């Protein structure tokens, strides 16, 4: 999930940011035109998915076909939840400190990570709630986009915001740490807590470890 030894030209980054703004604008327009009843239903499905994750004790590192089937919501799979429009955007992330605003996509495929932030399947959907822990991945150093390149500037006490449909969630950074890739398996939901962890590769250009920015919801 890392790009090695690449820098982003300013022109390419500007074009990619314009694309990201268009994707977010399309998402905002789609959800604004949606009936309130439909928005509420989509969020309720996501809440039920998160409740199932917690109740069944399923984590991303043990996600097989049986677990995916157990997590179906009224026959809907993970990829079918929180779909406000056809692009696959489930919401967007804003980090004011580093002037970042990125769409959030289902999964951590290269396609998703080249365009924005990827949500790690098998972790809580980023809609908040007790005993939830959403994990969001982003690239650093893509040749065409800045993405999570400046994530290391975040410090304890800083905040970031996630918007999914008409639900706006604010998280405060509680801890930053650097771990080995295999140590991500310890990221699980904690009872009664509402958490999000942002993940990218580090050191920049080496990418042997993962930088984790842990946040807990404050409003």
Where are the regions a protein language model picked out?
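Solvent-exposed, non-transmembrane regions of membrane-associated and secreted proteins
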Residues: 4-219
């Amino acid at each position: 999930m890392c790009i090695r030894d690449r820098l982003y030209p300013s022109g390419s980054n500007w074009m990619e940011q314009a694309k990201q703004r268009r994707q977010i604008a399309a998402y905002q327009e789609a959800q604004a035109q949606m009936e309130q009843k439909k928005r509420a239903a989509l969020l309720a499905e996501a809440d039920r998915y998160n409740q199932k994750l917690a109740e069944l004790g399923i984590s991303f590192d043990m996600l097989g076909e049986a677990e995916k089937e157990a997590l179906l919501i009224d026959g809907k799979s993970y990829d079918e939840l929180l779909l406000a429009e056809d692009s696959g955007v489930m919401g967007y992330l804003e980090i004011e400190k580093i002037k970042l605003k990125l769409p959030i996509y289902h999964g951590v495929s290269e396609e998703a990570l080249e365009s924005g932030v990827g949500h790690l399947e098998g972790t809580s959907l980023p809609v908040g709630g007790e005993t939830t822990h959403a994990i969001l991945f982003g690239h650093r150093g893509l040749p065409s986009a800045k993405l999570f390149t400046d994530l290391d500037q975040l410090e304890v006490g800083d905040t970031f915001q996630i918007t999914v449909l008409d639900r706006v969630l604010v998280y405060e950074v509680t801890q930053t740490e650097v771990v080995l890739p295999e140590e991500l398996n310890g990221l699980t939901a904690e009872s009664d807590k509402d958490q999000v962890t942002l993940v990218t590769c580090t050191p920049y250009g080496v990418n042997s470890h993962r930088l984790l920015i842990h946040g807990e919801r404050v409003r």
